[in-house]
Amino acid sequence: MSDFKKLQVWQKAHALSLTIDRICKRIRGSQYASLRSQLFRAAMSIPANIAEGRRKNSDKDFARFLGYALSSCSEVEYHLIVARDTKVISDSDFVSAISQTITVRKMLYGLLNRLSVPEDDGKVKGSKVRKSPQPKAGPPTAPSR
């Protein structure tokens, strides 16, 4: 696999992690230490999982790590909402970070769709459409009474 730093999604995720780092440094108060830590760790996890997955030997493994990165995007989004609602970050910091998070999430979904790695349940990773089960052969049976 090629160098993860060349992936646009990794570059955007890395930029997001730096934005979150700057935001976390401005969150004050010991009562917010857990929120600060979780937000920071979730943000750092996104580019880390992209990088780790890119080094794997198969698209299936890469897709699995992209799924982890997507989960971390959701976690970042939630922690940002909490930080905004508790007034520990500014509205402008929230808007900037949430916009970057949404961009990264869309890019991850796009990359997953291009990989088209089937999951065990017949769903293509990252898609919203499941494969339809094949109808059983044979005549329909009458309902029993």
Language-model segment annotations:
Residues M1-R145:
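Short, C-terminally biased terminal segments at protein or domain edges
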